[in-house]
Amino acid sequence: VHARLAEGCVQARIEGDDISLTCVSGHLEVMSRAGPADPLRLQPQQRLQADAQGHRPVELLDGSAMDQAAAWMRGEVLFRDTPLSQAAAEINRYRRGRLVILGDQLGRRTVTGRYRIDRLDDAIALIQKGFSARARHLPGGVVLLS
């Protein structure tokens, strides 16, 4: 996928072979590497997701989803009924060290909250307390929650 942002802001997220492009403002032109097809033009509140097999249909995001997608620009991470395993992965994008969730049952529990990126250790403490989880702090900023 090739993308060109003339002006505005886009959230780009790459995880393995998956890419997600969300147009926050302005417009974004996206072209496939596969061929000379006309580019897709994303407007604000539109998201395109693609993987090695191609892209899925463009989706229009509601205000809540846009708030979550743009939270990083305000220095925040935002969770709404997010499984703790996914919340930990998002926290790990911004925090030095690693937050590791031990146990599938704990990882499936959901978390809701708005946390400052520069204070993610506070977020971990709140999550630990809210779930009555045990935390083990290891060197290098590694935290094991069980």
What are the functions of these language-model segments?
Residues 1-146:
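A residue-level detector for the "anchor" residue at the start of short, highly conserved motifs
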